[in-house]
Amino acid sequence: MTRVFHPALSGPEQSRYQITDVASVSRSGLCINESPIRDRCGRTMGDLRLSVIDQCNLRCRYCMPEAEYAWLPRADLLSVDEISLIVDAFIAVGVDKIRLTGGEPLIRSDLAAIIEVISAKVGDGSGLQDLAITTNGVLLADQARKLKSAGMRRITISLDTLRPDRFKAISQRGTHYKVIEGIEAVAAAGFTDTKLDSVVIRGFNDDELSDLIEFARNVNAEVRFIEYMDVGGATQWSMDKVFTKAQMLSTLGKKYGPIAALPKYDSAPANRYRLPDGTTFGIIASTTEPFCATCDRSRLTADGIWLHCLYALSGINLRESVRAGASANDVVQILQRGWRDRANRGAEQRLAQRTRQVFLPVSRLKRDPHLEMHTRGG
């Protein structure tokens, strides 16, 4: 396999690098900074999307439509202890929100143990404030209570359609009923602030916006509509399939009347709105209105590659450093250097291209599975 990711420094080489701006020590004993670390664009680090597995039990046409994929070697996946160490380092440099992703995270057999070690860090004075997970919901009915017991705070479920026939067409699986059962199980388990993520594709499900809002309201959740994104490969993305934020608001305005935009207080990607009856929903317009300028998000693949951007073509291999003996403080140094060098504005650069070609061809993705969006939390 062609390696395009740059290994992080490990072993003796790391001793040449010192933390020069340490001002305090966290509860975990890690050196931290009094002032936030900023990248070259002035953005701080706050949100980590942590993939725990690259495999998925669906084959959604906008994400991973092919029958077979080159999976990451199982021995390369970060262990629970390795995840805990790396998470400590991320918290020490400013991460206050962590979201577990996949692939499909509920496939991983030791997911509960991962949740337990991370949830124990939430609210302990370290700075971590939130732990959430994104799932396709297929396995959720059987695992919702287990996730709650392990310490999961919030759940986001992907739900693009309420029609079983459309679900099968987009996911290539007949498990729509399991997703609905999973959503109901989340409410029964006592979760609140639940989100339903719906990728809106022109000519496919753009006629279901109000139905999805009503469904979300009935299950005590909030729907977030997502513009169809270009993730490359065999997805056959094209700009003419994008149903834009403006078009969504126009469609919903005709149905419900005046829609009020809600104030935005953080760097979350969704813009939130309120209907006349008080129902709220969100729109993530990452295709037509990229949020690169305020993006505080980075990604960690299931095998420990740290990516500064969803569209990054290279990253830093934290797994190699940890397995070579790096401590959490060593990882802190790697993160500090890496974030200060960050200048990624991937979605803005894609938007600026006059002719939108496929992000990455299938042939290149087959050579390096790290470039697949499903390995980096999509």
Curated annotation (Swiss-Prot):
Residues 40-259 form the Radical SAM core domain. GTP binds at residues 49, 99, 134, 195, 297-299. GO terms for biological process: Mo-molybdopterin cofactor biosynthetic process. It holds the Pfam family Radical_SAM. [4Fe-4S] cluster 1 binds at residues 56, 60, 63. Binds 2 [4Fe-4S] clusters. Binds 1 [4Fe-4S] cluster coordinated with 3 cysteines and an exchangeable S-adenosyl-L-methionine and 1 [4Fe-4S] cluster coordinated with 3 cysteines and the GTP-derived substrate. Pathway: Cofactor biosynthesis; molybdopterin biosynthesis. The keyword 4Fe-4S applies. It comes from the Bacteria. S-adenosyl-L-methionine binds at residues 62, 103, 158, 229. Its EC number is 4.1.99.22. Keywords: 4Fe-4S, GTP-binding, Iron, Iron-sulfur, Lyase, Metal-binding, Molybdenum cofactor biosynthesis, Nucleotide-binding, S-adenosyl-L-methionine. InterPro entries: Aldolase_TIM, Elp3/MiaA/NifB-like_rSAM, MoaA, MoaA_NifB_PqqE_Fe-S-bd_CS, MoaA_twitch, MoCo_biosynth_MoaA/MoaC, rSAM. Its cofactor is [4Fe-4S] cluster. PANTHER family: MOLYBDENUM COFACTOR BIOSYNTHESIS PROTEIN 1, MOLYBDOPTERIN COFACTOR SYNTHESIS PROTEIN A. Belongs to the radical SAM superfamily. MoaA family. Monomer and homodimer. Catalyzes the cyclization of GTP to (8S)-3',8-cyclo-7,8-dihydroguanosine 5'-triphosphate. This is GTP 3',8-cyclase 3.
